[in-house]
Amino acid sequence: AAEVATMRRFGESGRFIGLSDTWTLNEDWFTAVSVGAGDGAAYLPRYRVDGFVNRKLLASRQWVATLGAGYYRAPDGHIDRNISLGSTYYFESPWVVQAEVRFNNSSPGQVRTHQQFVAATWGRAKQTQVIARHGWGAEGYQAIGGGASLVNFDSRQTQLTLRQWVGPQWGFTAGVERYSNPFYDRNGAKLSLFWELP
């Protein structure tokens, strides 16, 4: 799948492009890889790479356990490396619930933090999906423009996203979010287009 997004934060416009793909190894195992890059905006990655290994559990294979790893390089030079553990349960349509914890090591300074999130999805792929997500925990670094960064702080983020297919392989996502940390609060919106490779 491919995604192109545009946004504006801290008085600076930014654009992000991402690519992702999933490979089915057998009826129980599958993997996923995503790569992405920003256009130089301070709050977007210069580039990032994330990979996941997934194992279907139970006789029904409705429960999926996930192990992930990621690398994030920011325009200001700091680097994040993370490992994540996740769990997803597919109820009878149209509900899916998900939880994840991520352990992050940021440099310079070897700042170690962790975050977690829970999410619920209503709807069906290739049609309409509504996703509610809440995350909380600590962040190692966050660029806020003008060469300034926040270091090792707690934050919370709540998002509501609509993912709508327009054609067999493409559509759009539209979402709103509420983000807060000890230094500022942010309310925002995001609009992006996606295209799923055949």
Model-derived regions, located:
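Residues that define the transmembrane beta-barrel architecture of outer-membrane proteins
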Residues: 13-17, 45-49, 79-83, 110-116, ...
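N-terminal entry module detector
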Residues: 1-16, 193-196
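Outer-membrane beta-barrel domain signature
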Residues: 5-12, 20, 36-44, 56-60, ...
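Residue-level signature of outer-membrane beta-barrel architecture
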Residues: 23, 55-57, 89, 122-124, ...
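Outer-membrane beta-barrel "beta-signal"
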Residues: 120, 186-198
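Outer membrane beta-barrel transmembrane domains
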Residues: 41, 119-121, 125-171
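Repeated loop/turn-to-beta-strand initiation elements of outer-membrane beta-barrel proteins
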Residues: 1-2, 27-33, 58-66, 93-99, ...
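Transmembrane beta-barrel strands of outer-membrane/channel proteins
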Residues: 2-6, 19, 33-37, 49-51, ...
